[in-house]
C-alpha cells in the first residue's frame, strides 16, 4: 500500500513538473493561432492567418534562411572538429589530455554573454568584420562540445578489440571503418549533429555579439517583441522555432537509445568479404 502511494505521489510530482515546464510554451503556441492581434486570454478564436502573414514577411523569410544556413554550417563544422577531437582523446594517451578535454567542454558551461563578448573582442582585435561567418564561428564554439561529448561517450563504451578483431580477420582500414567504426558511431554523430543544429538555430545571446547588422529568427523575436503590431507574427516565429528545436532533439534522443550491438556482427561479416 505504501509503495502504491509512493508511486502515485511521484507520478503527481512528475506531471506537475512537466506542466510547469511546458504550460507556458503551450500557451504561447496557442497564441500563434489567435484570431485577434491583441494578446488576451482566452483567445476569441483560432486562425492560421498569421502564419501566412509571417511567411509573406520578407524580414521573417530572410531571418529564417540565415538561421538555417548558420545552423547547418556550424553543425557541419562541429561534426568534423568534434569527431576528430573525440577520436584523438579517446584513442590516445598523452600529457595534458585531461586538460584539453576540459577546455573543449568549457565553452558550453560559460555564460553565453561571456562567450559573445569574448568573440566580439577577438574579432575587433583582428579587425574582422561581423558577418555570416562570425555567426558560424560563434555557434561552432558550443556546437563542437555537443558532438564531442556524443562521440566520446560512444567510443568509451566501445571496445577497441572490435577494430583489432576486424584487422586480424583481414579487413583493411576502409573496410574496418565502413563495417565496424561507422555503424557504431553513426547514431552518435547524427544525434550530436541534430542537437548541435537545435542549439545553433535558437541561439540568441552569442549571435547578438557576432551577427552585426544581420538578423536571425531569435534576434527577430527580440527586436520585435515590444512592437504590438508585430506580436502575432512574433508568436508564429516563436512557434516555428519551438518545432524546429523539438524535432531534432526528439530524434536525437531516439537515436541515442538505439541498440548498436549489430556492429559486432558486421565485424565478422568483413571476413567473408575479404577472403
Annotate the PLM regions.
Residues 2-6, 36, 51-59, 201, ...:
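Interhelical loop and adjacent transmembrane-helix boundary motif
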Amino acid at each position: 500500500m505504501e509503495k502504491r502511494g509512493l508511486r502515485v505521489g511521484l507520478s503527481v510530482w512528475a506531471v506537475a513538473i512537466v506542466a510547469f515546464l511546458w504550460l507556458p510554451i503551450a500557451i504561447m503556441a496557442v497564441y500563434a493561432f489567435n484570431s485577434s492581434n491583441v494578446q488576451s486570454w482566452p483567445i476569441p478564436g483560432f486562425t492560421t492567418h498569421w502564419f501566412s502573414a509571417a511567411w509573406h514577411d520578407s524580414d521573417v523569410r530572410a531571418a529564417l534562411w540565415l538561421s538555417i544556413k548558420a545552423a547547418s554550417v556550424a553543425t557541419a563544422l562541429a561534426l568534423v572538429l568534434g569527431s576528430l577531437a573525440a577520436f584523438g582523446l579517446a584513442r590516445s594517451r598523452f600529457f595534458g589530455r585531461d586538460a584539453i578535454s576540459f577546455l573543449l567542454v568549457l565553452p558550453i558551461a560559460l555564460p553565453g554573454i561571456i562567450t559573445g563578448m569574448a568573440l566580439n573582442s577577438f574579432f575587433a582585435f583582428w579587425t574582422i568584420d561581423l558577418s555570416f561567418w562570425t555567426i558560424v564561428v560563434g555557434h561552432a564554439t558550443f556546437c563542437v562540445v555537443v558532438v564531442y561529448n556524443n562521440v566520446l561517450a560512444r567510443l568509451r563504451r566501445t571496445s577497441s578489440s572490435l577494430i583489432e578483431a576486424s584487422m586480424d580477420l583481414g579487413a583493411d582500414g576502409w573496410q574496418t571503418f565502413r563495417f565496424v567504426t561507422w555503424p557504431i558511431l553513426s547514431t552518435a554523430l547524427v544525434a550530436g549533429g541534430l542537437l548541435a543544429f537545435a542549439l545553433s538555430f535558437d541561439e540568441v545571446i552569442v549571435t547578438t555579439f557576432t551577427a552585426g547588422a544581420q538578423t536571425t529568427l531569435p534576434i527577430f523575436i527580440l527586436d520585435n517583441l515590444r512592437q504590438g503590431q508585430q506580436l502575432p507574427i512574433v508568436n508564429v516565429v516563436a512557434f516555428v522555432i519551438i518545432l524546429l528545436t523539438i524535432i531534432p532533439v526528439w530524434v536525437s534522443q531516439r537515436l541515442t537509445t538505439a541498440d548498436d550491438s549489430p556492429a559486432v556482427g558486421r565485424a565478422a561479416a568483413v571476413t567473408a568479404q575479404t577472403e
